[in-house]
From Swiss-Prot:
NCBIfam families tied to this protein: cyt_tran_rel (TIGR00125), panC (TIGR00018)
GO molecular function: ATP binding; pantoate-beta-alanine ligase activity
Assembly, per entry: Homodimer.
Provenance organism: Geobacillus sp. (strain WCH70)
A biological process term (GO) from this entry: pantothenate biosynthetic process
Protein's name in the database: Pantothenate synthetase
Pathway: Cofactor biosynthesis; (R)-pantothenate biosynthesis; (R)-pantothenate from (R)-pantoate and beta-alanine: step 1/1
General function of this protein: Catalyzes the condensation of pantoate with beta-alanine in an ATP-dependent reaction via a pantoyl-adenylate intermediate.
Gene giving rise to this polypeptide: panC
Binding annotation for (R)-pantoate: 61, 153
Enzyme active site: 37 (proton donor)
Subcellular location: Cytoplasm
Length: 282
């Protein structure tokens, strides 16, 4: 596995692979890799000649009161996990390398951001889209891999690739879960033992919603109420949102039909957790 911190080296390497006719699978991350990331790496390994992984905690996507300084980092561990999972190139630039001077141009996301997490994190997805635009230009991959745990991010990346004509195939990989259903996340380490016991209620609530829809329920408000009620009954968490939209364009629906997302976010004392499911409804 080649490890590099320099943009120039990364570009040269990737260019060489492309000249050799090799396909490149790219997994952009903020590090502190867990099974969710490993699922992305495995999928990339199956589908490409070369797997490139980036680890970069992007300051642009953290709000003023968010956990940039506290976000877990362990680059040696990340390197080990990457190597064990067949990564060919490990790219871990510094903030100075990625942002050597203040940006004169930045990407602003116009659609798909005024709902879900985007609502309470203004500017967050502009930061995501800006760093991905940079990374896509540096790596120029054949395919880019993202987890459906952050389904709004997947929707934003879908729009970014489409609108900027990146010749990149977006591969969305299903959420990886603990045995009790809790979505794997770098932030789960913040949960107290009591909160960890309650946290699977998010996925259980979503499963209740799925069952109701399978039994014919088509009213989004009824579905949201059902999910909220389940979470309030089974946890001490404060609900940030429970929302239902069309997917991936994230538009409100009067009646459930087509591809939809049911998404939740809650705040425990020590961590904010998100989860979602997508369903195809006829």
């Amino acid at each position: 596995m080649i490890v590099t911190t320099k943009i120039q080296d990364m570009q040269t390497m990737m260019q060489q692979y492309r000249l050799e006719g090799k396909t490149i699978g790219f997994v952009p991350t903020m590090g502190y890799l867990h099974e969710g990331h490993i699922a992305l790496l495995k999928k990339a390994r199956e589908e490409n000649d070369i797997v490139a992984l980036s680890v970069f905690v992007n300051p642009l996507q953290f709000g003023p009161n968010e956990d940039f300084a506290r976000y877990p980092r362990d680059i040696e561990r990340d390197e080990r996990i990457a190597k064990e999972n067949g990564v060919d190139v490990f790219f871990c630039p510094s903030v100075e390398e990625m942002y050597p001077h203040p940006l004169s141009v930045q990407v602003t996301v116009k659609e798909r951001v005024d709902v879900l997490c985007g609502k309470s994190r203004p500017g967050h997805f502009d930061g995501v889209a800006t760093v991905l635009t940079k990374l896509f230009h540096i790596v120029m991959p054949t395919r880019a891999y993202f987890g459906m745990k952050d389904a709004q991010q997947v929707a934003v990346v879908d729009g970014l690739i489409r609108d900027f004509h990146f010749p990149i195939e977006l591969v969305a990989v299903p959420t990886v879960r603990e045995e009790d259903g809790l979505a794997k996340s770098s932030r789960n380490v913040y949960l107290s033992p009591e909160e960890r016991k309650e946290a699977p209620a998010l996925y259980q609530a979503l499963q209740q919603a799925k069952t109701a829809i399978e039994n014919g329920e088509r009213n989004p408000e009824t579905i949201c109420a059902l999910v909220k009620n389940y979470i309030q009954t089974h946890t001490h968490a404060e609900i940030d949102y429970v929302e239902v939209y069309s997917y991936p364009d994230l538009k409100p629906l009067e009646k459930l039909h087509g591809k939809v997302i049911i998404a939740v976010a809650v705040r425990f004392a020590s961590a904010r957790l998100i989860d979602n499911i997508t369903l195809d409804i006829v």
